[in-house]
């Protein structure tokens, strides 16, 4: 029982909390850096008439190369995110950097790519590092962590999708 839970929780864990209202929107499926379509009014100064208008993010279709995954990804990115990727030193560095605002603005696609990059890099998992050696304590610890991970990952369905993207799980030695 404990080893099954351990394999489920081994990787990936998503770092973003909160509810996603529209998971299939273009803002979740691409790297928009948190920017979305805004609506408002244009006001004519002389007469004070208002007209409705929409401001759309400055998005571009780009092929971005990941050095770690050795693969190109076709993504829509805003010019601001593109400048940040250049400043960070590449797509992998942009995805791996874990500032709270960056993690919130990645979107679902960004989080999936981040999980793939971290898995390929073999990043240490804090869940596995704190695993007790006693089997009874291990079971209680994993049950407690399972609830937290599922809350962080927002839903079981999304967790399963990302788990299938990562592919074969790392074999974990439970006698840590």
Swiss-Prot record:
<keyword id="KW-0689">Ribosomal protein</keyword>
<dbReference type="InterPro" id="IPR037147">
    <property type="entry name" value="Ribosomal_bL28_sf"/>
</dbReference>
<dbReference type="Pfam" id="PF00830">
    <property type="entry name" value="Ribosomal_L28"/>
</dbReference>
<dbReference type="InterPro" id="IPR026569">
    <property type="entry name" value="Ribosomal_bL28"/>
</dbReference>
<dbReference type="GO" id="GO:0003735">
    <property type="term" value="F:structural constituent of ribosome"/>
</dbReference>
<keyword id="KW-0963">Cytoplasm</keyword>
<keyword id="KW-0496">Mitochondrion</keyword>
<comment type="function">
    <text>Component of the mitochondrial ribosome (mitoribosome), a dedicated translation machinery responsible for the synthesis of mitochondrial genome-encoded proteins, including at least some of the essential transmembrane subunits of the mitochondrial respiratory chain. The mitoribosomes are attached to the mitochondrial inner membrane and translation products are cotranslationally integrated into the membrane.</text>
</comment>
<keyword id="KW-0809">Transit peptide</keyword>
<comment type="similarity">
    <text>Belongs to the bacterial ribosomal protein bL28 family.</text>
</comment>
<dbReference type="GO" id="GO:0005762">
    <property type="term" value="C:mitochondrial large ribosomal subunit"/>
</dbReference>
<keyword id="KW-0687">Ribonucleoprotein</keyword>
<dbReference type="GO" id="GO:0005737">
    <property type="term" value="C:cytoplasm"/>
</dbReference>
<dbReference type="InterPro" id="IPR034704">
    <property type="entry name" value="Ribosomal_bL28/bL31-like_sf"/>
</dbReference>
<dbReference type="GO" id="GO:0032543">
    <property type="term" value="P:mitochondrial translation"/>
</dbReference>
<protein>
    <recommendedName>
        <fullName>Large ribosomal subunit protein bL28m</fullName>
    </recommendedName>
</protein>
<feature type="transit peptide" description="Mitochondrion">
    <location>
        <begin position="1"/>
        <end position="8"/>
    </location>
</feature>
<comment type="subunit">
    <text>Component of the mitochondrial large ribosomal subunit (mt-LSU). Mature yeast 74S mitochondrial ribosomes consist of a small (37S) and a large (54S) subunit. The 37S small subunit contains a 15S ribosomal RNA (15S mt-rRNA) and at least 32 different proteins. The 54S large subunit contains a 21S rRNA (21S mt-rRNA) and at least 45 different proteins.</text>
</comment>
């Amino acid at each position: 029982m404990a080893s099954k839970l351990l394999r489920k929780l081994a990787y990936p864990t998503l770092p973003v909390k909160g509810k996603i209202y529209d998971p299939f929107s273009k803002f979740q499926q691409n790297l928009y850096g948190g920017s979305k379509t805004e609506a408002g009014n244009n006001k004519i100064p002389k007469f004070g008439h208002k007209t409705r208008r929409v401001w759309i993010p400055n998005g571009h279709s780009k092929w971005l190369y990941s050095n770690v995954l050795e693969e190109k990804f076709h993504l829509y990115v805003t010019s601001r995110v593109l400048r940040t990727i250049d400043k960070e030193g590449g797509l992998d560095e942009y995805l791996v950097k874990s500032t709270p605002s960056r993690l919130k603005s990645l979107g679902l696609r960004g989080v999936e790519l981040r999980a793939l990059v971290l898995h390929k890099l073999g990043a240490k998992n804090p869940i596995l590092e704190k695993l007790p050696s006693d089997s009874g304590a291990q079971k209680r610890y994993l049950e407690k962590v399972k609830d937290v991970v599922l809350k962080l990952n927002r839903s079981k369905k999304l967790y399963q999708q990302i788990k299938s993207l990562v592919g074969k799980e790392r074999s974990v030695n439970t006698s840590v």
